[in-house]
Amino acid sequence: MKPNAVLDGAKAYIFDMDGTLVDNLAYHVRAYHIFSRRYGHELTDAQIIGWTGATNRYFMERILGRPASADEAKRMEDEKESLYRTLYAPHLALAPGARELLDRAHRAGIVCAVASGAPTQNIDFVLDGLRIRDVFAAVVDASQYARGKPAPDCFLTAAAKIGVAPPDCVVFEDAVYGVQAAHAAGMRVVALTTSSSRATLEAASADLVVASFTELMA
């Protein structure tokens, strides 16, 4: 499908963060490898990437091999995410074409929001580190909704916060769980191939698959 066919008529753009606004997957993968070894568990790249879009608690329970209490999962999450931020900080940058797309949306009067499964500290790290917080009318993190992707909660929460009906929203995602969540919310979805292959994202029924935001700027 051509970009215009997906983007035309949109009143809001809702962006996932990890792997979408920022191409940071490699640093999350490195952090999970180091972190999981601390707990005597070796994860493969395929496992980590395959779980992209799931909650951190899901990851922690896979590492432990058992259910985790809320306190235990939170403690482990804080440890892993601190490691990730340390690894990624010297490389923090917007994904190619993201700034241009955000600027174009602003000129067109399209409302922008962030809806992420990331913890608040990671979202603050990116938005404040890149000085783009004021671009977004709403920022939704994992503490603001009950069910993680592929449930639609994060995107529906974002749409409610900005006052735009789901059919008028376009979601930008990089993960299969995110694509499924966007469709479950009744939204169109553009998927980037930063963490999943084109074939995988097309099989998940993404409305449009692109390698980067620059393809949307033609």
Residue ranges of predicted features:
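N-terminal helical cap/lid subdomain that shapes the substrate entry/recognition surface
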Residues: P3-I110, R133
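Residue-level signature of catalytic and energy-coupling elements of molecular machines
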Residues: T20, S116, A151
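Hydrophobic beta-strand core positions in alpha/beta domains
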Residues: A113-V114, A191
